[in-house]
Amino acid sequence: MATIRKGNQDDCAAMAEIFNHYILNSNVIFSNRVRSAEDMRQLVEPVVDRFPFYVAESSGKVIGYCFAHKWMPDPVYGRTLEITIYLSHEATGQHIGSQLLERVIDDCHHLGTHRLISFITEGNEPCERLHAAHGFRLMGVLPEVGYKFGRYLNDAIYLKDLC
């Protein structure tokens, strides 16, 4: 059974491990560069005290994380946040992603967020289903914007209205 709790910078090593699995073994992440715990700290530093950030833990080990962050730096986009969510490959299919995403969505709603946006590699069916189940709508596809493992990849844009 997983426990959902607020995330913090002490979780960054485990987050990097989860993230790096997908970098090395899938096209879920449009990157070939492995991340360190310090890289993850820099990523979440502006998030920790300002935006919703949760981790799932089982037997004392972080097995997933989800947070909201600025979609764009310009203040005119301030009421639209982007969602980032990853689960350990061993933790998929256990509704942990739903628990994490629900907490982040609820917190975003209470913050007065107008829209949530998520970019998903087209064909990542578990992630597409997760977002659709939580009210995200497919808004469009950016064709062949990524290239990994010898093939071009599409990025799908999902949007959820909160207000």
Where are these regions (language model features)?
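A short beta-loop-alpha structural element at the N-terminal edge
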Residues: T3-M15
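Conserved GNAT acetyl-CoA-binding A-motif
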Residues: C108-I120
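Glycine-rich phosphate/pyrophosphate-binding loop shared by adenosine-nucleotide-utilizing enzymes
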Residues: A2, K61-Y65, L153
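Active-site acidic-Proline motif in GNAT/NAT acetyltransferases
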Residues: I85-E90, Q94, D106, E122-G123
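Conserved acetyl-CoA-binding loop-helix of GNAT-fold acetyltransferases
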Residues: G93-D106, R129-A133
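Acetyl-CoA-dependent GNAT
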Residues: R33-E90, L101-E102, D161-L162
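Conserved GNAT-fold acetyl-CoA-binding loop/helix
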Residues: A16-L43
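Conserved catalytic-core motifs of GNAT/GCN5-like acyltransferases
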Residues: K70, I117-I120, A132, R137-N154
